[in-house]
C-alpha cells in the first residue's frame, strides 16, 4: 500500500476469491501485500492481521493452495525485511509455505532505491533459522530455492520458456 489514500483498495483480501474463480489465470501480487512497519509473525487463521497475512488469509479462506495461480513478488518488500532477520524469516517463511516455493518471485524496485546489490547479497546469504523451521513449519532456503526465487519462478507468470532462463 502507498499511503493512506484509498488504503482499503490496496489490500489483498480479494486475491483468493478471484484466484479461485479463474484458476487458469495467474495473479501476481506485487510487494506480496507487505505493509511497512508491520512486525511479521506466524500466520494465525482468523487473526485479522494486515499485510502479508491478508493475502494468506484470502488464500486459506478460498482454498487456493501453494503453487497454484497466485504469485508473491518481493519488490521493495525484501529491501525492508532484510534488516530484521526474524521479520524476514516470518515473511518469507509464510510466503513460501502458503503461496508455494514455485510462486515467490524476486523483485527489487531498484528504480526507487538504486543498485540492488545489497539486496541480492542479503538474500544469497539469508537463512530461516532451524528454530523457526521447526516451530512454524517454514522451509529451509536452499541453493535451488534461491535460484527459483531469483529467476526460475518467473517463467510461468511472464510466459518465458524455462530453457531461455537456463
Residue ranges and their predicted role:
Residues 109:
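Active-site glycine-centered loops adjacent to acidic/histidine catalytic or metal-binding residues
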Residues 1-106, 132-140:
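Catalytic pocket-lining loop regions of alpha/beta-barrel enzymes
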Residues 94, 98-105, 113-166:
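Mid-to-C-terminal alpha-helical segments outside catalytic/metal-binding sites
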Residues 81, 112-113:
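Alpha-helix N-cap/loop-to-helix initiation residues
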Amino acid at each position: 500500500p502507498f499511503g493512506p489514500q484509498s488504503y482499503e483498495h490496496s489490500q489483498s483480501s480479494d486475491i483468493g476469491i478471484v484466484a479461485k474463480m479463474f484458476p487458469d489465470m495467474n495473479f501476481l501480487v506485487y510487494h506480496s501485500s507487505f505493509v511497512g512497519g508491520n512486525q511479521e509473525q506466524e500466520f494465525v487463521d482468523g487473526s485479522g492481521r494486515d499485510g502479508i497475512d491478508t493475502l494468506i488469509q484470502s488464500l486459506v479462506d478460498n482454498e487456493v493452495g501453494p503453487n497454484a495461480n497466485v504469485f508473491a513478488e518481493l519488490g521493495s518488500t525484501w529491501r525492508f525485511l532484510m534488516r530484521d532477520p526474524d521479520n524476514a524469516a516470518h515473511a518469507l517463511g509464510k510466503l513460501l509455505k502458503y503461496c508455494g516455493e514455485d510462486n515467490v518471485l524476486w523483485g527489487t524496485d531498484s528504480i526507487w532505491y538504486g543498485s540492488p546489490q545489497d539486496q541480492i547479497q542479503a538474500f544469497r546469504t539469508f537463512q530461516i533459522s532451524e528454530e523457526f523451521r521447526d516451530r512454524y513449519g517454514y522451509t529451509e532456503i536452499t541453493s535451488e530455492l534461491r535460484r527459483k526465487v531469483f529467476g526460475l519462478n518467473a517463467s510461468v507468470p511472464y510466459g518465458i520458456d524455462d530453457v531461455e532462463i537456463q
